[in-house]
């Protein structure tokens, strides 16, 4: 049953922390939750417009949001900050303007956006899944792509990884699921630090679903 539940939500409060750090009254909770979704959508849209292309990817691992009375703090964890900052000279400032314009409406609140570099980006499942998606969209064989992704991940300090791809692999008529694992991935162990992500790849044959589980360590 370990694969039937999201590994991140399963460990929330044990080995995983929330990506949004704020408190709200019951009347404001849904509003703040929707605003957080809009912030993340603004960042995704900027990355797809200005950074990501057929040979390049955004490299955003996660976005953390903190709130104060009149201030929203947004921290972007990225493996390749140069792409995000230097793509149009003022990338972070443009993201801040987009968020301010699309999010705050007429409310008087300030937005502060920062970026944090991840030392070993291929140890992050979101970045690794984005790499796999680009390879599949460029018609690289899925088995070769999985092998290369595992090699990149093994260069970081992880103890195990599992990659699963589902869909019309290599353009076959019947969809199927293929997966590969290296090392241990103990999904049932709550103290195990497991990172997980799902990422869709848009190919000419349809959508391929990519799932990655990364086992870092045990607490």
Curated annotation (Swiss-Prot):
Biological processes per GO annotation: translation
Keyword Cytoplasm: no
Entry GO terms, CC: chloroplast; cytosolic small ribosomal subunit
PROSITE patterns for the chain: KH_TYPE_2, RIBOSOMAL_S3
Residues of the KH type-2 domain: 47-119
Stretches of the chain forming a coiled coil according to its record: none
Localisation: Plastid, Chloroplast
Gene Ontology MF terms in the entry: rRNA binding; structural constituent of ribosome
UniProt keyword list: Chloroplast, Plastid, Ribonucleoprotein, Ribosomal protein, RNA-binding, rRNA-binding
InterPro entries (alphabetical): KH_dom-like_a/b, KH_dom_type_2, KH_sf_prok-type, Ribosomal_S3_C_sf, Ribosomal_uS3_bac-typ, Ribosomal_uS3_C, Ribosomal_uS3_CS
Entry annotated with the keyword Ribonucleoprotein: yes
Family matches, as Gene3D superfamilies: 3.30.300.20, Ribosomal protein S3, C-terminal domain (3.30.1140.32)
Quaternary context: Part of the 30S ribosomal subunit.
Family classification: Belongs to the universal ribosomal protein uS3 family.
Protein name according to UniProt: Small ribosomal subunit protein uS3c
Species: Huperzia lucidula (Shining clubmoss)
Gene field: rps3
